[in-house]
Amino acid sequence: MSFSEFYQRSINEPEAFWAEQARRIDWRQPFTQTLDHSRPPFARWFCGGTTNLCHNAVDRWRDKQPEALALIAVSSETDEERTFTFSQLHDEVNIVAAMLLSLGVQRGDRVLVYMPMIAEAQITLLACARIGAIHSVVFGGFASHSVAARIDDARPALIVSADAGARGGKILPYKKLLDDAIAQAQHQPKHVLLVDRGLAKMAWVDGRDLDFATLRQQHLGASVPVAWLESNETSCILYTSGTTGKPKGVQRDVGGYAVALATSMDTIFGGKAGGVFFCASDIGWVVGHSYIVYAPLLAGMATIVYEGLPTYPDCGVWWKIVEKYQVNRMFSAPTAIRVLKKFPTAQIRNHDLSSLEALYLAGEPLDEPTASWVTETLGVPVIDNYWQTESGWPIMALARALDDRPSRLGSPGVPMYGYNVQLLNEVTGEPCGINEKGMLVIEGPLPPGCIQTIWGDDARFVKTYWSLFNRQVYATFDWGIRDAEGYYFILGRTDDVINIAGHRLGTREIEESISSYPNVAEVAVVGIKDALKGQVAVAFVIPKQSDTLADREAARDEENAIMALVDNQIGHFGRPAHVWFVSQLPKTRSGKMLRRTIQAICEGRDPGDLTTIDDPASLQQIRQAIEE
């Protein structure tokens, strides 16, 4: 079957299509209804069926290939490596499941996980899935008041954390941040379970705090039966990053999530049992949830949990892992590749990467210079894919198992099965033509694996995502265009639009142009208020040649050259009013550019919540650049 036929069947006959894909996982009780869409926009998949994520990820493969590698935990920060076969992982998950039950955690209870990228984090999430508890991972980069808000929203029965994590040689004091968060929260968890890594001193709270290792010793050899869950019971809550005010918890189911991930591993990611999948993300983000915690294991692959940066202790660290563990498939974000692009390629090519078959990139738009560089350097297909926290798996990609069309630089590919993607005119709501920019939406119902609702707030779910044009379309909040061959291009957020004297431009379009200039390593473009034009674009550039930063005359020449390039590629209306050169740009710890923060600084406004920022010194660089 061609991909076109596969895709059209998913749109024209969604129930028959997804009933077939559901055979990829084990069901204890068969489902009686593939889709219940009687209360749009809410969609319920595989109704009446019972299954379990942990069973499908661990037990199923323990029975088929007990001695195959399942979990590889690597920390370049502490120079530790631990490996678990499927048999060993099964044993550890049962122990932790018994620990959770001993602390009174029941089916449907929330367990908040605030942990570094260590094996215990992965095992804890699988243990939650085993007993039917709902896990809610809070990214380790969040500060205390943000953690407190998530505690109050999820109301966990238990919090699992650690003394500390590490990043770039710096210790991140998780326990101290967590203590501060609990002090600020209204909801008080009964217990806090702590992994003591010996990285930071902890203040223990009697009666509340428990040592992970001590409790583990009490449950060695435990066997905990799987809780068979109705497909639409909640598996997890994952809060979207950068949220202000009340957190927005994306709620996901059990059966639909398992089926979607299992299908994606086969058709999109080419996962084969016995292989090794290295997703260089964090379990606190959706990419980590889907493609570290669950999807590789669902496919019978080993999954790598990595603590550290791509450049610490040196920029060869990822490639050492690829070589040592014979990684077949790798998943990262364009930001990490841009960082690596600044270093000599010899530090990559010195490693035997012959096992690597493909690199997948997602999380932000992939610019053409970065795509070209990494494709040439690694010598393997580089496959962009586009999705969101809310979708849980790719909305757009290239399904290599079914589709041999070539990648197109700058494009995340074509809509994936189940996603009835449309581009609509922002004013009329009518479909856009070829190469016509529009708002990217998805016709309901959303396919399996996507957001069920916002935790505890159905009304907010409907208002936030389903209120465009009085139609049953899900708003992605992204601009896009489609070319004559059906490839899509993402042009940036609908709220990252610059209106320059009546010309509406996505920041992505200007960034793409500037990125093609030879001396540009990375760029961020924002729109700021202007008395004459309403808004103007300004650009902050990290140059490849750092002497640009020291020589004002050289910087002025480079600025003029970049402006001329934008004039030529987009038009004079797209030309930035200023191009400033900096050595770093404000980003979250997951690599997302903080464009709104940059914009606020440029306009003299309060930049707001900065709890997720990686390096606060980058803000000072922005301030200094605009003052000079």
Swiss-Prot record:
Protein's GO biological process: propionate catabolic process, 2-methylcitrate cycle
Keywords on record: ATP-binding, Ligase, Nucleotide-binding
Pathway: Organic acid metabolism; propanoate degradation
PROSITE patterns associated with the record: AMP_BINDING
Catalytic activity: propanoate + ATP + CoA = propanoyl-CoA + AMP + diphosphate
EC number, as in UniProt: 6.2.1.17
Gene3D superfamilies for this protein: 3.30.300.30, N-terminal domain of ligase-like
Molecular-function GO terms, alphabetical: ATP binding; propionate-CoA ligase activity
InterPro entries recorded: ACAS_N, AMP-bd_C, AMP-bd_C_sf, AMP-binding_CS, AMP-dep_synth/lig_dom, ANL_N_sf, Propion_PrpE
Pfam family, one: ACAS_N
Enzyme class: ligase
Family the UniProt entry places it in: Belongs to the ATP-dependent AMP-binding enzyme family.
Function text: Catalyzes the synthesis of propionyl-CoA from propionate and CoA. Also converts acetate to acetyl-CoA but with a lower specific activity.
Name this polypeptide is given: Propionate--CoA ligase
UniProt organism field: Salmonella typhimurium (strain LT2 / SGSC1412 / ATCC 700720)
